[in-house]
Amino acid sequence: MKLPYFLLGLAGLAAASPMGLAERQLSDGNELRDGSCKPIIFIFARASTEPGLLGISTGPAVCNDLKMAKAGQVLCQGVGPAYTADLMSNALPDNTSPAAISESESLFKLAASKCPNSQILAGGYSQGTAVMDDSIKQLPDDVKDKIKGVVLFGYTRNAQEGGQIGNFPKDKVKIYCAMGDLVCDGTLIVTAAHFTYVMNTGEASQWLESKLSDTTTSSLTGSSSSDTSSSTSTGDSSSESSSAAGLGGLSGLTGLGSSTSGGFPSLASLF
């Protein structure tokens, strides 16, 4: 039965931002490849089934926030097209495909080589968090040093990596794991909580801005002075709790088992 994978796909389709689709798509998400350098480069990996390179929820929201705060200084790049954001890749050992990991690595290296004076910010949602984790931890140190901050929404490798990105400074990572989002516990069980992260994008954008050096000057209104709000955190890499209010009708979405051997279940166990 393939219904559980359909439910996992809802994570990408149901996490709609309150703002309109057209308003959220101010960037085509291919600005690093197609454009000239700017002081800040934001690289993002979308959730499973989300269209485009940035997706239609958390990615465009953070991109737009950063562009509003740092007018004319930000370019946004989504991971794709090699990263297809397909459902089946969630069950692979790295919780995403080798092609996606390789493409993400290449984008970070491109940012560092094409724009050596730029600061890099990054993020991911759902399967996109695995893309970020698996690619960033493999980067050479000189490229890692250029990455100032990473935000992860619904971190699918949160349990496997101990609430951080492997081989990367914890104080450069902000993890949002909503209360009741079981993918953060190392499962493929999708609940309503996994759809709530658009509520965290404003704070996430402010946190990313706070990690930048003083080479850029404008500031997001109401920037947070702390890495956490109403959440429990471990060090600087924190797990945020967010409410599933308004999504109670989806709260019964379950159906996938717990992970084994550090990854998600084998494909055979999902049908």
Swiss-Prot record:
It catalyses: cutin + H2O = cutin monomers. The keyword GTP-binding does not apply. Gene3D superfamilies: alpha/beta hydrolase. It holds the Pfam family Cutinase. Its EC number is 3.1.1.74. It is found in: Secreted. It is an enzyme of class 3 (hydrolase). Residues 216-245 are annotated as: Disordered. One of its GO terms (cellular component) is extracellular region. This is Probable cutinase 2. Residues 1-16 form the signal peptide. One of its GO terms (molecular function) is cutinase activity. The record marks S48, Q127 as: Transition state stabilizer. Belongs to the cutinase family. GO terms for biological process: carbohydrate catabolic process. Catalyzes the hydrolysis of complex carboxylic polyesters found in the cell wall of plants. Degrades cutin, a macromolecule that forms the structure of the plant cuticle. It comes from Aspergillus niger (strain ATCC MYA-4892 / CBS 513.88 / FGSC A1513). Disulfide bonds join C37-C115, C63-C76, C177-C184. The active site is at S126, D181, H194. Keywords: Disulfide bond, Hydrolase, Secreted, Serine esterase, Signal.
